[in-house]
Amino acid sequence: MKRLLVLTGGGDCPGLNAVIRAIVKRAAQEKEWEVLGSIQAYNGILWEPTEVVRLTPELVRGIHFRGGTIIETTNKGGPFNWPVKNADGTWSTIDRSDEMLRKLQYMGIDAVISIGGDGSQRISQKLYEKGLNIIGVPKTIDNDLSSTECTFGFQTAVQIATEAVDKLVTTAASHNRVFVLEVMGRDAGWIALHSAIAGGAEVCLLPEFPYDINIVKTRLEQRFNHDRGFAVVVASEGARPKDGQQVYEISTEVGYENKKLGGIGRRFIEEMKAAGFSHDMRETTLGHLQRGGVPIAYDRVLSAEFGVKAFEMVLNGQFGQMVAYHHPDVVAVSLKEAVAQPNLVSLDSDLVRTARGLNISLAI
Protein backbone atom coordinates (compact mmCIF):
# COMPACT_ATOMS: atom_id res chain seq x y z
CA MET A 1 0.00 0.00 0.00
CA LYS A 2 1.40 3.39 -1.04
CA ARG A 3 1.02 6.36 1.30
CA LEU A 4 0.17 9.96 0.40
CA LEU A 5 0.46 12.73 2.99
CA VAL A 6 -1.74 15.83 2.63
CA LEU A 7 -1.24 19.04 4.59
CA THR A 8 -2.63 22.58 4.67
CA GLY A 9 -0.35 25.50 5.55
CA GLY A 10 -0.62 29.26 6.04
CA GLY A 11 -3.87 31.11 6.67
CA ASP A 12 -7.12 29.26 6.14
CA CYS A 13 -9.45 30.11 3.28
CA PRO A 14 -12.74 28.88 1.78
CA GLY A 15 -12.20 25.76 -0.32
CA LEU A 16 -9.50 23.93 1.63
CA ASN A 17 -11.84 21.14 2.66
CA ALA A 18 -13.09 20.81 -0.91
CA VAL A 19 -9.51 20.22 -2.10
CA ILE A 20 -8.92 17.61 0.61
CA ARG A 21 -12.16 15.83 -0.29
CA ALA A 22 -11.28 15.79 -3.99
CA ILE A 23 -7.84 14.29 -3.32
CA VAL A 24 -9.29 11.56 -1.11
CA LYS A 25 -12.15 10.68 -3.46
CA ARG A 26 -9.81 10.47 -6.46
CA ALA A 27 -7.28 8.41 -4.51
CA ALA A 28 -10.02 5.98 -3.46
CA GLN A 29 -10.34 4.95 -7.10
CA GLU A 30 -6.74 3.69 -6.96
CA LYS A 31 -6.90 0.75 -4.57
CA GLU A 32 -3.20 0.82 -3.67
CA TRP A 33 -3.17 4.31 -2.12
CA GLU A 34 -3.76 5.36 1.50
CA VAL A 35 -4.19 9.08 2.26
CA LEU A 36 -3.00 10.62 5.52
CA GLY A 37 -3.37 14.17 6.82
CA SER A 38 -0.75 15.98 8.89
CA ILE A 39 -2.28 18.19 11.59
CA GLN A 40 -1.32 21.88 11.35
CA ALA A 41 0.85 21.60 8.25
CA TYR A 42 4.26 20.06 9.01
CA ASN A 43 3.72 20.35 12.77
CA GLY A 44 1.92 17.02 12.83
CA ILE A 45 5.07 15.31 11.57
CA LEU A 46 7.52 17.25 13.73
CA TRP A 47 5.60 16.98 16.99
CA GLU A 48 6.31 14.18 19.44
CA PRO A 49 4.21 12.13 19.23
CA THR A 50 3.24 12.77 15.63
CA GLU A 51 -0.32 13.88 14.88
CA VAL A 52 -1.49 12.33 11.64
CA VAL A 53 -5.01 11.20 10.70
CA ARG A 54 -6.16 8.74 8.07
CA LEU A 55 -8.27 10.54 5.48
CA THR A 56 -10.96 8.17 4.27
CA PRO A 57 -13.92 8.77 1.95
CA GLU A 58 -16.16 8.48 5.01
CA LEU A 59 -14.22 11.14 6.92
CA VAL A 60 -14.36 13.68 4.07
CA ARG A 61 -18.00 13.08 3.18
CA GLY A 62 -19.86 16.39 2.90
CA ILE A 63 -16.94 18.64 3.86
CA HIS A 64 -16.73 20.41 0.49
CA PHE A 65 -19.09 23.20 1.58
CA ARG A 66 -17.50 23.71 4.99
CA GLY A 67 -15.02 26.50 5.64
CA GLY A 68 -11.67 25.97 7.32
CA THR A 69 -9.68 22.75 7.12
CA ILE A 70 -10.36 19.48 8.93
CA ILE A 71 -6.61 18.89 9.31
CA GLU A 72 -6.02 22.40 10.70
CA THR A 73 -3.33 24.82 9.57
CA THR A 74 -0.71 27.21 10.89
CA ASN A 75 1.32 30.14 9.62
CA LYS A 76 3.97 29.89 12.34
CA GLY A 77 7.18 27.90 12.17
CA GLY A 78 7.96 25.17 9.67
CA PRO A 79 10.62 22.54 9.03
CA PHE A 80 13.26 25.14 8.11
CA ASN A 81 12.58 27.57 10.98
CA TRP A 82 11.20 25.54 13.86
CA PRO A 83 10.73 27.76 16.96
CA VAL A 84 12.65 26.77 20.09
CA LYS A 85 12.35 28.48 23.47
CA ASN A 86 15.71 29.04 25.13
CA ALA A 87 16.46 28.67 28.84
CA ASP A 88 16.44 32.45 29.31
CA GLY A 89 12.93 32.72 27.86
CA THR A 90 13.98 34.04 24.46
CA TRP A 91 13.15 32.31 21.19
CA SER A 92 15.29 31.07 18.34
CA THR A 93 14.69 28.86 15.31
CA ILE A 94 16.37 25.69 14.07
CA ASP A 95 16.32 23.71 10.83
CA ARG A 96 14.52 20.37 11.32
CA SER A 97 14.00 19.60 7.64
CA ASP A 98 16.41 16.65 7.50
CA GLU A 99 14.85 15.18 10.63
CA MET A 100 11.40 15.54 9.11
CA LEU A 101 12.47 13.85 5.88
CA ARG A 102 13.78 10.92 7.90
CA LYS A 103 10.46 10.69 9.76
CA LEU A 104 8.52 10.72 6.49
CA GLN A 105 10.71 7.92 5.19
CA TYR A 106 10.19 5.95 8.41
CA MET A 107 6.41 6.42 8.06
CA GLY A 108 6.54 5.06 4.52
CA ILE A 109 5.30 8.28 2.88
CA ASP A 110 5.64 7.99 -0.89
CA ALA A 111 4.42 11.50 -1.79
CA VAL A 112 3.25 14.76 -0.22
CA ILE A 113 0.64 17.26 -1.41
CA SER A 114 1.10 20.66 0.22
CA ILE A 115 -1.87 23.04 -0.01
CA GLY A 116 -0.70 26.56 0.73
CA GLY A 117 0.31 30.01 -0.43
CA ASP A 118 3.62 31.48 -1.51
CA GLY A 119 5.37 30.77 1.79
CA SER A 120 4.18 27.16 1.85
CA GLN A 121 5.22 26.60 -1.75
CA ARG A 122 8.69 28.03 -1.09
CA ILE A 123 8.99 25.37 1.60
CA SER A 124 7.75 22.80 -0.93
CA GLN A 125 10.44 23.84 -3.41
CA LYS A 126 13.19 23.58 -0.78
CA LEU A 127 11.97 20.14 0.30
CA TYR A 128 11.82 19.01 -3.32
CA GLU A 129 15.44 20.10 -3.73
CA LYS A 130 16.22 17.88 -0.75
CA GLY A 131 14.66 14.91 -2.53
CA LEU A 132 11.05 14.86 -1.30
CA ASN A 133 8.33 13.77 -3.72
CA ILE A 134 6.09 16.79 -3.27
CA ILE A 135 3.36 18.58 -5.23
CA GLY A 136 1.92 22.00 -4.45
CA VAL A 137 -1.67 23.23 -4.56
CA PRO A 138 -1.93 27.06 -4.53
CA LYS A 139 -4.03 28.60 -1.77
CA THR A 140 -4.34 32.32 -1.17
CA ILE A 141 -7.34 34.62 -1.00
CA ASP A 142 -5.00 37.43 -2.12
CA ASN A 143 -4.70 35.76 -5.56
CA ASP A 144 -1.04 36.84 -5.62
CA LEU A 145 0.62 33.79 -7.21
CA SER A 146 1.63 34.71 -10.76
CA SER A 147 1.78 31.17 -12.16
CA THR A 148 -1.97 30.59 -11.80
CA GLU A 149 -4.76 32.80 -13.11
CA CYS A 150 -6.86 32.24 -10.01
CA THR A 151 -6.64 30.58 -6.61
CA PHE A 152 -9.55 29.05 -4.74
CA GLY A 153 -10.99 31.17 -1.95
CA PHE A 154 -10.35 34.41 -3.81
CA GLN A 155 -13.79 34.66 -5.40
CA THR A 156 -15.46 33.90 -2.06
CA ALA A 157 -13.40 36.65 -0.40
CA VAL A 158 -14.42 39.06 -3.18
CA GLN A 159 -18.06 38.12 -2.66
CA ILE A 160 -17.79 38.78 1.08
CA ALA A 161 -16.07 42.13 0.48
CA THR A 162 -18.63 43.12 -2.16
CA GLU A 163 -21.51 42.35 0.18
CA ALA A 164 -19.82 44.57 2.77
CA VAL A 165 -19.56 47.42 0.24
CA ASP A 166 -23.26 47.00 -0.61
CA LYS A 167 -24.22 47.28 3.06
CA LEU A 168 -21.94 50.21 3.75
CA VAL A 169 -23.38 52.12 0.78
CA THR A 170 -26.85 52.07 2.32
CA THR A 171 -25.73 53.17 5.78
CA ALA A 172 -23.36 55.78 4.32
CA ALA A 173 -26.21 57.26 2.26
CA SER A 174 -28.51 57.28 5.29
CA HIS A 175 -26.04 59.23 7.44
CA ASN A 176 -24.15 61.29 4.83
CA ARG A 177 -20.87 59.64 5.77
CA VAL A 178 -17.74 58.30 4.16
CA PHE A 179 -17.02 54.69 5.02
CA VAL A 180 -13.56 53.20 4.58
CA LEU A 181 -13.64 49.44 4.14
CA GLU A 182 -10.33 47.69 4.86
CA VAL A 183 -9.96 44.35 3.07
CA MET A 184 -7.15 41.83 2.88
CA GLY A 185 -4.31 42.23 0.41
CA ARG A 186 -0.76 42.49 1.70
CA ASP A 187 1.09 43.21 -1.54
CA ALA A 188 -1.63 42.58 -4.14
CA GLY A 189 -4.86 44.57 -4.30
CA TRP A 190 -7.06 42.14 -6.22
CA ILE A 191 -9.74 41.78 -3.53
CA ALA A 192 -10.02 45.55 -3.13
CA LEU A 193 -10.13 46.23 -6.86
CA HIS A 194 -12.71 43.54 -7.64
CA SER A 195 -15.00 44.51 -4.76
CA ALA A 196 -14.67 48.24 -5.51
CA ILE A 197 -15.83 47.63 -9.08
CA ALA A 198 -18.57 45.19 -8.08
CA GLY A 199 -19.85 47.38 -5.26
CA GLY A 200 -19.50 50.77 -6.94
CA ALA A 201 -16.97 52.34 -4.57
CA GLU A 202 -15.80 55.90 -5.13
CA VAL A 203 -12.13 55.32 -4.29
CA CYS A 204 -9.91 52.22 -4.23
CA LEU A 205 -6.51 52.17 -2.49
CA LEU A 206 -4.10 49.44 -3.59
CA PRO A 207 -0.68 48.29 -2.30
CA GLU A 208 0.77 48.55 -5.80
CA PHE A 209 0.11 52.29 -6.14
CA PRO A 210 0.87 54.59 -3.18
CA TYR A 211 -2.01 57.03 -2.85
CA ASP A 212 -2.06 60.83 -2.79
CA ILE A 213 -4.26 61.96 0.10
CA ASN A 214 -4.93 65.32 -1.57
CA ILE A 215 -6.35 63.60 -4.66
CA VAL A 216 -8.76 61.66 -2.43
CA LYS A 217 -9.73 64.80 -0.49
CA THR A 218 -10.49 66.71 -3.69
CA ARG A 219 -12.47 63.81 -5.12
CA LEU A 220 -14.65 63.32 -2.04
CA GLU A 221 -15.27 67.05 -1.59
CA GLN A 222 -16.45 67.25 -5.20
CA ARG A 223 -18.83 64.39 -4.53
CA PHE A 224 -20.28 66.08 -1.44
CA ASN A 225 -20.56 69.40 -3.27
CA HIS A 226 -22.64 67.77 -6.00
CA ASP A 227 -25.34 66.53 -3.62
CA ARG A 228 -23.87 63.04 -3.27
CA GLY A 229 -23.24 63.34 0.45
CA PHE A 230 -21.76 59.90 1.01
CA ALA A 231 -19.05 57.62 -0.34
CA VAL A 232 -17.32 54.28 0.18
CA VAL A 233 -13.56 53.88 -0.03
CA VAL A 234 -12.16 50.35 -0.36
CA ALA A 235 -8.59 49.97 0.90
CA SER A 236 -6.26 46.98 0.80
CA GLU A 237 -4.60 46.37 4.16
CA GLY A 238 -1.24 46.84 2.43
CA ALA A 239 -2.07 50.25 0.93
CA ARG A 240 0.21 53.15 1.84
CA PRO A 241 0.47 56.88 1.09
CA LYS A 242 3.12 58.38 -1.13
CA ASP A 243 6.41 58.55 0.78
CA GLY A 244 4.78 56.50 3.55
CA GLN A 245 4.79 52.96 4.89
CA GLN A 246 2.23 50.21 5.35
CA VAL A 247 0.47 50.03 8.73
CA TYR A 248 1.68 46.96 10.61
CA GLU A 249 2.87 45.49 13.89
CA ILE A 250 5.89 43.23 14.38
CA SER A 251 5.20 40.06 16.35
CA THR A 252 8.08 37.94 17.70
CA GLU A 253 6.00 35.46 19.67
CA VAL A 254 7.60 32.33 18.20
CA GLY A 255 11.17 33.41 17.67
CA TYR A 256 11.05 35.24 14.36
CA GLU A 257 9.55 38.49 13.16
CA ASN A 258 6.05 38.30 11.73
CA LYS A 259 4.63 41.39 10.00
CA LYS A 260 0.94 41.78 10.89
CA LEU A 261 -0.82 44.29 8.64
CA GLY A 262 -3.89 46.22 9.69
CA GLY A 263 -5.07 49.72 10.49
CA ILE A 264 -4.94 51.45 7.12
CA GLY A 265 -8.58 52.52 7.46
CA ARG A 266 -7.99 54.31 10.74
CA ARG A 267 -4.80 55.99 9.53
CA PHE A 268 -6.43 57.05 6.26
CA ILE A 269 -9.20 58.83 8.19
CA GLU A 270 -6.60 60.61 10.33
CA GLU A 271 -4.77 61.70 7.17
CA MET A 272 -7.99 63.00 5.64
CA LYS A 273 -8.80 65.03 8.74
CA ALA A 274 -5.25 66.41 8.81
CA ALA A 275 -5.69 67.44 5.16
CA GLY A 276 -8.81 69.43 6.09
CA PHE A 277 -11.63 67.05 5.13
CA SER A 278 -14.48 67.95 7.48
CA HIS A 279 -17.17 65.38 6.72
CA ASP A 280 -17.98 62.42 8.97
CA MET A 281 -15.87 59.32 8.29
CA ARG A 282 -15.98 55.80 9.73
CA GLU A 283 -13.86 52.71 9.11
CA THR A 284 -14.79 49.04 8.94
CA THR A 285 -12.27 46.19 8.87
CA LEU A 286 -13.43 42.87 7.44
CA GLY A 287 -10.39 40.96 8.68
CA HIS A 288 -10.76 37.21 9.01
CA LEU A 289 -14.39 37.25 7.90
CA GLN A 290 -12.90 37.02 4.40
CA ARG A 291 -11.20 33.73 5.28
CA GLY A 292 -14.09 31.94 6.96
CA GLY A 293 -17.39 30.47 5.98
CA VAL A 294 -18.85 28.59 3.06
CA PRO A 295 -17.00 28.72 -0.30
CA ILE A 296 -19.12 29.89 -3.23
CA ALA A 297 -19.80 27.47 -6.10
CA TYR A 298 -16.92 28.78 -8.24
CA ASP A 299 -14.38 28.07 -5.51
CA ARG A 300 -15.84 24.63 -4.79
CA VAL A 301 -15.45 23.68 -8.46
CA LEU A 302 -11.91 25.09 -8.69
CA SER A 303 -10.95 23.32 -5.46
CA ALA A 304 -12.29 20.04 -6.81
CA GLU A 305 -10.33 20.50 -10.03
CA PHE A 306 -7.15 21.29 -8.11
CA GLY A 307 -7.54 18.28 -5.81
CA VAL A 308 -8.16 15.77 -8.59
CA LYS A 309 -5.31 17.21 -10.67
CA ALA A 310 -2.91 17.10 -7.73
CA PHE A 311 -3.50 13.40 -7.14
CA GLU A 312 -3.19 12.61 -10.83
CA MET A 313 0.15 14.45 -10.79
CA VAL A 314 1.19 12.09 -7.99
CA LEU A 315 0.24 9.12 -10.16
CA ASN A 316 2.25 10.58 -13.04
CA GLY A 317 5.29 11.33 -10.89
CA GLN A 318 5.12 15.08 -11.59
CA PHE A 319 6.92 16.07 -8.41
CA GLY A 320 8.44 19.49 -7.85
CA GLN A 321 5.43 21.01 -9.58
CA MET A 322 2.30 22.90 -8.58
CA VAL A 323 -1.27 22.78 -9.82
CA ALA A 324 -2.28 25.94 -11.71
CA TYR A 325 -5.31 27.30 -13.53
CA HIS A 326 -4.65 28.47 -17.08
CA HIS A 327 -8.09 29.06 -18.54
CA PRO A 328 -9.77 26.80 -19.44
CA ASP A 329 -7.39 24.09 -18.20
CA VAL A 330 -5.86 22.99 -14.91
CA VAL A 331 -2.17 22.37 -15.58
CA ALA A 332 1.13 21.69 -13.83
CA VAL A 333 3.84 24.35 -13.44
CA SER A 334 7.20 24.08 -11.71
CA LEU A 335 7.33 25.12 -8.06
CA LYS A 336 10.37 27.21 -8.88
CA GLU A 337 8.34 29.17 -11.42
CA ALA A 338 5.35 29.39 -9.08
CA VAL A 339 7.24 31.27 -6.34
CA ALA A 340 9.48 33.36 -8.61
CA GLN A 341 7.36 36.52 -8.53
CA PRO A 342 3.99 37.68 -7.17
CA ASN A 343 0.86 38.42 -9.19
CA LEU A 344 0.32 42.15 -8.75
CA VAL A 345 -2.16 44.64 -10.18
CA SER A 346 -0.64 46.61 -13.07
CA LEU A 347 -1.76 50.01 -14.34
CA ASP A 348 -2.26 48.69 -17.87
CA SER A 349 -4.51 45.80 -16.80
CA ASP A 350 -8.07 45.45 -18.07
CA LEU A 351 -9.37 45.64 -14.51
CA VAL A 352 -7.70 48.99 -13.83
CA ARG A 353 -8.96 50.28 -17.17
CA THR A 354 -12.46 49.15 -16.18
CA ALA A 355 -12.21 50.89 -12.80
CA ARG A 356 -11.13 54.12 -14.43
CA GLY A 357 -13.89 53.76 -17.02
CA LEU A 358 -16.34 53.63 -14.11
CA ASN A 359 -14.72 56.76 -12.64
CA ILE A 360 -13.33 54.92 -9.60
CA SER A 361 -10.33 56.85 -8.31
CA LEU A 362 -7.09 55.02 -7.46
CA ALA A 363 -5.77 58.25 -5.91
CA ILE A 364 -2.64 58.35 -8.06
Where are these regions (language model features)?
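A cross-family phosphate/adenosyl-ligand binding-site feature
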Residues: 1-9, 17-108, 115, 119, ...
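Accessory alpha-helical/coil subdomains and C-terminal extensions
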Residues: 35, 103, 111-116, 122-126, ...
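Short gly/pro/ser/thr-enriched loop/turn and capping motifs at secondary-structure boundaries
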Residues: 42-45, 140-145, 211-213, 241
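Short beta-strand segments
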Residues: 7-8, 38-39, 72-73, 114-116, ...
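Short, acidic/small-residue loops that bind anionic groups at enzyme active sites
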Residues: 32, 36, 127-151, 205-209
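A glycine- and small-aliphatic-rich helix-loop capping segment at beta-alpha/alpha-beta transitions
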Residues: 21-30, 51-58, 126-136, 152-156, ...
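Short beta-strand elements at the ligand-binding edges of bilobed clamshell
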Residues: 147-158, 293-300
